[in-house]
Design a protein with these regions (language model features):
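Aromatic "clamp/platform" in nucleotide-sugar-dependent glycosyltransferases that forms part
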Residues: 320
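Short hydrophobic beta-strand element within catalytic cores of glycosyltransferases
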Residues: 337-340
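Conserved donor-binding/catalytic core segment of Leloir-type glycosyltransferases
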Residues: 232-250, 256-259
Length: 419
């Protein structure tokens, strides 16, 4: 179960996991708030007005707690509204219930309680830290969740000793107690963070990466890719990808700074290198870069996205906090090295100067050095092969599906219910 079918990293990862399971002997369906495709294995909720009401009610409650300021309005989730999915035929037929990213009015804490009362085994994949904190998805260094969330930085005046984060934390604590939920983290980094939470004390937690379909994401001719993507054949391409490229957490200011510093050191790049930016608001960035730029906008067609990755010589993701970015996995599956900050789950993906470059955290100079390494110093063929080997060994559909099947059996055994 995931709020969205396509939008966001958790949606993409959940859809890929469903495909991986179906391709490896498990009959899996994905429940979403709003179905956007004609995929028969995806089920959408009915009741458009009710769904909108759930979404708006949660946002309104958060807005009130923010003293009617929009700051952090979509960084907070309290799960006080959602649909009771236990009445659905698909729920009744299921042997295991698998939660993913279920916020923004999709499933409430009360709804999760009903799921648990059904007696069915529950697995919950964490795509961020929200299941292990009070109200936030990324903690930005705050470690209050180790004991109890309070004095939350996302709330006006840094909250209080009994603020909204405290109340939701305690509701989760009561919900999780003796629940038997089996948690899965997509990265070791996130798993290590989550295990420190007082909410998850004594709970099962495994680390399983997201899968990728290597029959779909694979290297193709750069000439063909650039023709399809309408990108220049006579230049090296630096690629940046994000759902919304101006999102603070994705580190666009560091990308701009690194590119401009690199061009100042190597002015010849103005003639032989360009930047492609994939994601919404990409046209807002081009005027800030010293290189010719191609704003590609928000693209949903997967074949177009694959062509764009294959057009690139290097992929750059200066995220300030990230779990296990799908975009790095996608670039690697196409044989394209990634340059990123050493943070979150990214070091589990990038082997420094083998399949990419790990730059010092928040260091635009080292980010620039990484781009230069990928473009001018690395053995491109060897790096591309290392990328493909990494993906094949760790993120293939079969590898990931087998690990999840083991988790499902563990969760079912805990409920004395073997699948």
């Amino acid at each position: 179960m995931n709020t969205s079918e396509h939008v966001g990293g958790a949606a993409v990862a959940s859809g890929r996991l469903m495909d991986a399971l179906n391709n490896n002997g498990v009959k899996a369906k994905m429940l979403v708030m709003n179905k956007e495709s004609d995929n028969i294995t995806v089920v959408g909720l009915s009741g458009r007005f009710r769904k909108q009401l759930h979404f708006l009610w949660e946002r309104w409650c958060i807005f009130c707690h923010l003293h009617f300021h929009r700051d952090h309005l979509f960084e907070i989730d309290i799960a006080n509204a959602g649909t009771d999915i236990t009445r659905l035929r698909e729920f009744k037929e299921a042997d295991v219930i698998h939660l993913a990213w279920i916020n923004q009015g999709f499933i409430s804490l009360k709804g999760i309680k009903k799921i648990l009362k059904s007696g069915k085994p529950v697995v919950w994949t964490m795509h961020d830290l929200w299941p292990a904190t009070g109200i936030c998805h990324y903690t930005r260094g705050c470690m209050a969740f180790k004991n109890v969330c309070q004095n939350c930085r996302l709330l006006p005046g840094d909250g209080s000793n009994n603020d909204l984060s405290t109340k939701i934390f305690k509701r989760k604590q009561e919900l999780f107690r003796r629940s038997g939920i089996h948690f899965v983290s997509c990265s070791k980094w996130l798993g290590d963070q989550a295990r420190q939470s007082a909410l998850l004390t004594g709970m099962g937690l495994d680390v399983i990466p997201n899968p990728i379909d290597t029959k779909l994401y694979h290297p193709i001719s750069k000439h063909e890719a650039r023709l399809h993507s309408m990108l220049p054949e006579d230049k090296r391409i630096i690629l940046f990808v994000s759902q919304r490229v101006t999102h603070e957490r994705k580190g666009m200011p560091f990308f701009i700074d690194a590119i401009n510093k690199l061009v100042a050191l190597h002015p010849e790049m103005k003639d032989n290198t360009a930047v492609a930016i994939l994601g919404s608001h990409s046209d807002e960035i081009t005027g800030q870069l010293s290189l010719q730029s191609y704003p590609l906008g928000y693209v949903t067609n997967e074949l177009e996205i694959i062509s764009i990755y294959n057009s690139a010589d290097v992929y750059v993701l200066p995220s300030l906090e990230d779990n296990l970015p799908n975009t790095i996995m996608e670039a690697m599956a196409c044989g394209v090295p990634s340059v990123a900050f050493k943070t979150g789950g990214i070091p589990e993906m990038i082997d420094h100067q083998k399949n990419g470059y790990l730059a010092k955290y928040r260091d635009a100079d080292d980010l620039a050095a990484g781009i230069h390494w990928a473009l001018d110093e690395a053995d491109k063929d060897a790096v591309a092969q290392n990328c493909l080997r990494k993906v094949s060994a760790n993120y293939s559909q079969r590898t990931v599906a087998m690990k999840y099947i083991e988790v499902y059996n563990q969760a079912a055994a805990f409920k004395n219910y073997k699948i």
